[in-house]
Curated annotation (Swiss-Prot):
Keywords: Cell cycle, Cell division, Mitosis, Nucleus, Ubl conjugation pathway
GO biological process, one term: cell division
Quaternary organization: The APC/C is composed of at least 13 subunits that stay tightly associated throughout the cell cycle: anapc1, anapc2, anapc3, anapc4, anapc5, anapc6, anapc7, anapc8, anapc10, anapc11, cdc20, cdc26 and cdh1.
Feature: compositional bias, Low complexity: 59-81, 547-581
Protein name stated in the entry: Anaphase-promoting complex subunit 4
Lineage: Eukaryota, Amoebozoa, Evosea, Eumycetozoa, Dictyostelia
Keyword Cell division assigned: yes
Length: 837
């Protein structure tokens, strides 16, 4: 019996709650007690970096609070909110992506966070569950035809090598012919694969081309310093994969690339609706726990092993072939969603930026106008600052307080900063905001065209919904485009106003004006600005930009009851008819003419700019609601098998039940179960080959052995942690236990689907007495004898790297190399390193 090679045995400084081994790279992720994610290398135990998850969630929560409160100073409960977030967002599960470049974590509050391993950035967060995320699994799609072609190519290569040995004289000629044959085979194989595999479809290159339609947004993605936007282009090149998330009550969600939710399954409610007659314990069960779950690499079958709260163990197999049938469409929609999400983030960031710049400008001006009001109050004047300046503009002679304010309180260079801020806002709008919107509009248009022209998108995209969203985006886009003209008008009005103030100041002070500061001004523009009000928000006010001239159309979105309501443009025109006429003549701040020409597009938009943008940000993602409704309805239950049950109220007996699932390329599913519930110490291997039947074989364990944990290692063997009771001659109970990491073979050949073991049909549950088919024995193991009785002992596998990470307690980790030795060892030569438990 061969030993596993011990690579590292480390004592960690902090307790570890959960951990995960990367399947493709030499990495292990550890989640500490304080919810920090520490990334180490296997071999050297080099610490690469640490992701502080709690700081990410708190910063994100504070950002959301600031967005929701806007100008309100509601910061009294921030500390309490942060404490609640710390407890609610505590990490309970972790899983690597198939390519090893991302890592997903499930939290106590049901939220899921995706981090990029290359730069430790937060890629995405979602909150699709209301209960803790109990288990995560990340599956990469592998086409059946592709795997068969690879096997055929391997066989052909072997035949070619034999021919080379037999015909050594013509070796050079044969090599040239073989190279040509291989090239043709590769071309033919790739051509066949392109018709059925997800990676090469044309829509991938089309999406990449669409990203470059507007160079400004491409420039932004390449030069952005914003840490919250994931710019990774690898998602457009990697194969299609699905993240499976399971919460503590049995709700399952499937996320394409870990980012886009495509399916949600309430397993318990579906079992009660369709399979309550299968077993008498299904109907009264109130919750269930998912023990293990797997999705076949062909995306055809979803197999779940569950335990109900009343002690029933079930195996559920679901037909998910619709994922295979519509995988290209789902793949494209997922990528469009991801690109749309990036663009929306970009739009949100720059809207916040121009809002902050405008608030800063308004605050500077408001401070100056408050000083003016104080001067008027000191002189006992009851007139407004606008009236004083209008009188000055009309008569040319200032009142005493106005004279004092202009002479002593105005710094024209500081006021000119308002113009530069307006110019900066306009630049951001042209460079980033409008291109982001145009890309979003283009994506919605592409999805709308697909829903009309391509039958494959039927059931995934609702044509009417996408059309309504497209119309809404057009209306919002026109409003957004008018914002650029509005900013130009505001800048022009303030330029005239400040130039006039500077001229008056120079006249009162009897000084020669500076030519750089002395610019021409328009008196009508100044008059319209003063009549509008110096404290009036010209940029984000409802009455100036986003007033609706009529009631909303039937196709308009439902209004938000919590958002403030505003007067229509008709009422504003009635109250300020003269003002609006002057505004339109001097700079068209109000855009009444544009509103009249585009009235049909504006009917469904109400509220101020921020309310509209918030509604727009949520509405564009309603495009993808149909896919999450239709796909789950097309899933079909193939079978529900009750395996065994136990009395949870009977605490006198400690029952054990461990299980593991694995799917083979031909959609065969294997299930390993270790249980003491059948009054026997056995390991059952169950095989599912068709829709209706499971068959099984079992292995008898010695009475002193018990399996602590088991996992499938590959398509022919499984790994298990086996505990052995050590009972001395003068004792009845064991005082010490030895723990082994063992590898068992459940299938004869990894590349051969045939199996010489006898499998018996599994009817209702595991029989109490079964014919002994084989004696359980491992062909490779490692004995771990602990110095003290530390528990629990768990392990995780990295199948591609052939590494096992065994955790002993909460702070000790032992890494073992599971690779086969090249040299055979003689039987009986075992040098097990013993650690006493």
């Amino acid at each position: 019996m061969k030993d596993f090679v011990l690579l590292n045995d480390k004592i960690l400084p902090n307790d570890v709650k959960c951990y995960s081994c990367c399947t493709t790279m030499d990495l292990i992720a550890l989640v500490t007690k304080d919810d920090q994610i520490v990334i180490h290398r296997f071999l050297t135990w080099q610490k690469l970096f640490t992701i502080n998850h709690m700081s990410t969630t708190i910063n994100d929560n504070n950002t959301n609070n600031n967005n929701n409160n806007n100008n309100n100073n509601n910061n009294n409960n921030n500390d309490n909110n942060n404490d609640n977030d710390k407890s609610n967002k505590s990490i309970v599960s972790i899983q690597w992506s198939p390519n090893g470049k991302m890592i997903s974590i499930g939290c106590e509050d049901g939220s899921i966070f995706i981090y990029n391993i290359e730069n430790a950035k937060l890629i995405n967060k979602s909150h699709n569950h209301k209960h803790p995320i109990h288990k995560l699994a990340w599956i990469k799609e592998v086409s059946q035809q592709r795997s068969q072609q690879q096997q055929q190519q391997q066989q052909q290569q072997q035949q070619q090598q034999q021919q080379q040995q037999q015909q050594q004289q013509q070796q050079q000629q044969q090599q040239q012919q073989q190279q040509q044959q291989q090239q043709q085979q590769n071309k033919n194989g790739s051509t066949k694969c392109n018709n059925n595999y997800v990676s090469p479809p044309l829509f991938l290159s089309q999406i990449k081309q669409n990203m470059n339609l507007f160079p400004s947004i491409s420039y932004y993605f390449e030069n952005s310093k914003e840490e919250n936007i994931y710019l990774g282009g690898d998602i457009y090149d990697r194969p299609f994969d699905i993240l499976i998330c399971c919460d503590s009550i049995g709700v399952i969600s499937l996320l394409a690339f870990g980012l886009f939710k495509i399916v949600t399954i309430d397993l318990l409610s579906l079992l009660k609706q369709k399979y309550s007659n299968t077993h008498f314990l299904i109907k009264p069960s109130k919750s269930l726990k998912i023990l293990d779950i797997t999705l076949t690499e062909s995306l055809n079958k979803l197999s779940v092993m569950i335990e109900t709260d009343n002690g029933l163990f079930l195996s559920v197999t679901i037909d998910t072939s619709i994922l295979l049938e519509k995988r290209n469409e789902i793949h494209e929609i997922s990528l469009q969603y991801f690109l749309l999400f990036q663009l929306q983030q970009s739009l949100d960031i720059h809207i916040k930026e121009i809002t902050e710049k405008w608030k800063e400008t308004q605050q500077q001006l408001s401070t100056k106008w408050v000083e003016f009001e104080k001067v008027l109050s000191d002189y006992g004047f009851s007139s407004s600052i606008e009236q004083e300046l209008i009188d000055l503009l009309m008569c040319g002679v200032p009142s005493p307080p106005t004279n004092q304010f202009i002479v002593n309180n105005i710094n024209i260079k500081k006021l000119k900063l308002t113009e530069s801020n307006c110019n900066s806002i306009r630049e951001i709008l042209i460079k980033y905001i409008l291109p982001s919107f145009l890309n979003i509009f283009h994506i919605i248009t592409v999805l709308h065209n697909n829903s009309l022209e391509n039958d494959g998108y039927k059931g995934l995209l609702d044509t009417n919904t996408v059309k309504n969203i497209l119309d809404y985006c057009g209306s919002f886009g026109m409003r957004l485009q008018s914002l650029e003209t509005l900013i130009c008008g505001i800048e022009s009005h303030y330029t005239s106003f400040f130039s006039w103030l500077y001229k008056v100041q120079c006249t009162l002070n009897e000084i020669q004006p500076d030519r750089k500061l002395s610019l021409p001004f328009n008196e009508l523009s100044i008059m319209s600005l003063l009549k509008k009000g110096l404290k009036f928000d010209l940029l984000f006010s409802t009455s100036t930009l986003f007033s609706s001239s009529s009631s909303s159309s039937p196709s308009s979105p439902p209004s938000n009851n919590n958002s403030p309501t505003f007067s229509s443009s008709s009422s504003i025109n009635n109250n300020n008819n003269n003002n609006n006429n002057e505004l339109n003549q001097s700079g068209n701040i109000g855009f009444s003419n544009n509103n009249e020409n585009l009235e049909f597009q504006y009917k469904d938009l109400k509220g101020n700019f921020h309310d509209l943008f918030k509604d727009f940000s949520s509405k564009i993602f309603e495009t993808f609601n149909e896919i999450t409704i239709v796909l789950p309805s097309l899933f079909k239950f193939e079978n529900v098998i009750p395996f065994c049950l136990y009395d949870k109220n009977d605490t006198s007996v400690s029952h054990k039940f461990n299980c593991s699932l694995i799917s083979h390329p031909n959609d065969t599913i294997y299930l390993s179960i270790y249980t003491t519930l059948s009054n026997s110490n056995r390991l059952f291997i169950c095989k599912r080959e068709d829709k209706l039947n499971w068959s099984f074989t079992c292995y008898q364990l010695n009475e002193k052995y018990s399996i602590l944990d088991c996992k499938f290692y590959n398509n022919s063997s499984l790994m298990a942690l086996v505990s052995e009771d050590i009972i001395k001659a003068n004792q009845k109970k064991s005082t010490r236990k030895n723990t082994y990491l063992k590898q068992y073979q459940y299938k004869t050949d990894d590349n051969d689907d045939s199996d010489n073991r006898e499998y018996i049909k599994l009817d209702v549950n595991i029989p109490q007495s079964t014919i002994l088919l084989d004696l359980l024995d491992s062909f490779k193991s490692r004995e771990i004898i602990l110095k003290s009785r530390i528990s629990p002992i768990t392990f995780e596998l990295s199948t591609s790297r052939k590494i096992s990470a065994t955790f002993i307690g909460k702070r000790r980790v032992a890494l073992y190399d599971l690779a086969e030795d090249e040299e055979e060892e003689e039987e009986g030569e075992e040098e097990d390193i013993c650690l006493v438990r």
